Amino acid sequence: MHRAPVGRNAEGQYFMFCFEHVKEYNKGYNFFSGLSDSEVARYQKEAITGHRPTWTVGVNKNAKNGPTQSQTRSGSAGAQARMRDPFGFVSEARARSGRPEPRQRKLKTLEAKAFETLGLGASATTADIKAAYKDLVKKHHPDANGGDRGSEERFRAVIQAYQLLKQAGFC
């Protein structure tokens, strides 16, 4: 005895036939009989995902509002920057528990000097750091100042400050 499916609306139910009759039954069996072409196409499209619900890629508005990877910082400050709380659940829980908001990253001495060299505060964004670097390099470049030694030293200090901030993950 061999199983043969009863039909589309009777899944899990089978007729029991001998081998010869199963072959004959299967030749004439059509799972999509009684369905229009558009219904068959819809079934085939849904079968790609196993008939599970799907959503269009990129429609989540919160996916666009977060900082880009290049704007995030490293360490615990980076983890805080990447965390999103669109409904305010975490901030409400912190307010109820009396715990303060997470602290900003404490600058090391060289990092603070680097920000000072670029003329920026510790809360400067990646874009601010890059803009200040670009302006100062143009201003103090030896070709722009006729080879002035004082300007050349400032030029080196600006480059070193930017490289330090870049290595520290600020830009």
UniProtKB/Swiss-Prot annotation:
Outline the extent of the J domain: 113-170
Give me the stretches of Polar residues compositional bias. 57-77
InterPro entries the UniProt entry points to: DjlA_DnaK_co-chaperone, DnaJ_domain, J_dom_sf
- Superkingdom of the source? Bacteria
Gene3D superfamilies linked to this entry: DnaJ domain
Pfam families (UniProt xref) = DnaJ
CDD domains for this protein: DnaJ
Where is the segment annotated Disordered? 56-83
Q: What is this protein called?
A: Uncharacterized 19.0 kDa protein in cobS 5'region
